[in-house]
UniProtKB/Swiss-Prot annotation:
<dbReference type="GO" id="GO:0000049">
    <property type="term" value="F:tRNA binding"/>
</dbReference>
<dbReference type="InterPro" id="IPR001247">
    <property type="entry name" value="ExoRNase_PH_dom1"/>
</dbReference>
<dbReference type="InterPro" id="IPR020568">
    <property type="entry name" value="Ribosomal_Su5_D2-typ_SF"/>
</dbReference>
<dbReference type="Pfam" id="PF03725">
    <property type="entry name" value="RNase_PH_C"/>
</dbReference>
<dbReference type="GO" id="GO:0000175">
    <property type="term" value="F:3'-5'-RNA exonuclease activity"/>
</dbReference>
<dbReference type="GO" id="GO:0008033">
    <property type="term" value="P:tRNA processing"/>
</dbReference>
<keyword id="KW-0698">rRNA processing</keyword>
<keyword id="KW-0819">tRNA processing</keyword>
<protein>
    <recommendedName>
        <fullName>Ribonuclease PH</fullName>
        <ecNumber>2.7.7.56</ecNumber>
    </recommendedName>
</protein>
<dbReference type="GO" id="GO:0016075">
    <property type="term" value="P:rRNA catabolic process"/>
</dbReference>
<dbReference type="Pfam" id="PF01138">
    <property type="entry name" value="RNase_PH"/>
</dbReference>
<dbReference type="InterPro" id="IPR015847">
    <property type="entry name" value="ExoRNase_PH_dom2"/>
</dbReference>
<keyword id="KW-0548">Nucleotidyltransferase</keyword>
<dbReference type="InterPro" id="IPR050080">
    <property type="entry name" value="RNase_PH"/>
</dbReference>
<dbReference type="InterPro" id="IPR027408">
    <property type="entry name" value="PNPase/RNase_PH_dom_sf"/>
</dbReference>
<keyword id="KW-0808">Transferase</keyword>
<comment type="subunit">
    <text>Homohexameric ring arranged as a trimer of dimers.</text>
</comment>
């Protein structure tokens, strides 16, 4: 039986709280069960040097975990003097995922940075970050539309992400830490609301998985993301 007696295709309880901080153009607290991430969107009227003069905008992301977001205290990466490989991989994934939902030409020569700060980790921090940052990004775009900076909405659609895996021989959706730590297969799927996939990251931690199991995992991810899109729409309607 899964933790909290969840069905195999049932994500953890999802909660998205908008306008969570005061200063950012968009801010969200996203909760996937006990995993909690603050996502803020910051708008700047400039772009990276490689984009200057091209009439296009940019969306990027940074990711970090508070020292006591986990069971034992982690040293801050700032104290170490460099970012770890996991951090860089995750923030690039978040940035790629969010760029897929934006028409960068319609955004104009401005950049939006999504900061995803994990305040409590219980598995799925990268998928929660993407799902919450999507809403924060939309709020930042709405801010630009409302003040007249933008006249065309550059948002193509919602983006959400969820983990799936094989645990004790069973395919399951939205793994929490106790499942993730023993999973035979672990996969993260990022999807647009029209069903197209942005990224699939899958690894066999033990026994290799079959083609049939892969298709089952992707179907579970689609079912899970559809529930996340509902949660995003509900939050954006509030």
């Amino acid at each position: 039986m899964r933790p909290n007696a969840r069905a195999i295709n049932q994500p953890r309880p999802i909660k998205i709280t908008r306008h969570y901080t005061k200063h950012a153009e968009g801010s969200v607290l996203v909760e996937f069960g006990e995993t909690k991430v603050i996502c803020t969107a910051t708008v700047e009227d400039s772009v990276p040097r490689f984009l200057k003069g091209q009439g296009k905008g940019w969306v990027t992301a940074e990711y970090g975990m508070l020292p006591r977001s986990t069971h034992s205290r982690m040293q801050r990466e700032a104290a170490k003097g460099k970012q770890g490989g996991r951090t860089m991989e995750i923030q690039r994934l978040i940035a790629r995922s969010l760029r897929a939902m934006v028409d960068l030409e319609a955004l104009g020569e401005r950049a939006i940075t999504l900061d995803c700060d994990v305040i409590q980790a219980d598995g799925g921090t990268r998928t929660a970050s993407i799902t919450g940052a999507c809403v924060a990004l939309i709020d930042a775009i709405n801010f630009l539309l409302q003040n007249g900076t933008l006249t065309t909405n550059p948002i193509k659609g919602l983006v959400a992400a969820i983990s799936v895996g094989i645990v004790n021989g069973e395919t399951v959706c939205d793994l929490e830490y106790v499942e993730d730590s023993i999973a035979e297969t672990d996969m993260n799927v990022v999807m647009m609301e029209d069903g197209r996939m942005i990224e699939v990251q899958g690894t066999a931690e033990g026994e290799p998985f079959s083609h049939a199991e892969l298709l089952t995992l992707l179907d579970l991810a689609k079912q899970g993301c559809e529930q996340l899109f509902v949660a995003q729409r509900v939050a954006l309607a509030e």
